[in-house]
Amino acid sequence: MSIEARLAELGVTLPAAPAPAANYVPFVVSGNLVHISGQISQNAAGLIKGKLGVDVTVEQGAEAAKCCAISLLAQLKAACGGDLTRVVRAVKLTGFVNSAPDFTDQPKVINGASDFLVAALGDAGRHARAAVSAGSLPLGVAVEIDAIFEIRV
C-alpha cells in the first residue's frame, strides 16, 4: 500500500510544509538522505504548548509528537518534489520533550511519532531514535522532533 493510501486510511491529510521560524532551511537533501529540521508540535488549531510533568499528560504529549511526525512527512514530501513513492525508509528521529526535571517518560511521548510513522510507512517507518528531555523548547511548545529519511534519487 502506498504512503498516500495509508495516510488516507489513517484520516490524515498532510498540511503544507511549515516555513522555518528562523535562519535555517526546513530540510537538506544530501545524496539519498533527507535531513529534516526540527518540527515543533502544532496542528490546525495552532501551537501545542506546555511542559510534560506539569500541565501536559503523556497521552497529550504523544499526540503532540504525532503532530510533529505529520509535519516531518509534509517536509519529506516537499523534499521529494511531492512524490512520496521516492521514500525508502525512516532512518532516525531525535525527539525533544519539554519536561519537568523529574519527568522520565520521554520515550512514551516520542512513541506518538514513532507509532504514527510505522502506521504511515509500514516497516519502512521503523527507525533508530533518541528521546531527550529539554527544560524548554522554542515558543513554549511541548515537543520538537527532527529526522533523517532515505529516499530514491
What are these regions (language model features)?
Residues 1-153:
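Short, polar/acidic, helix-capping and beta-turn segments at strand->helix junctions
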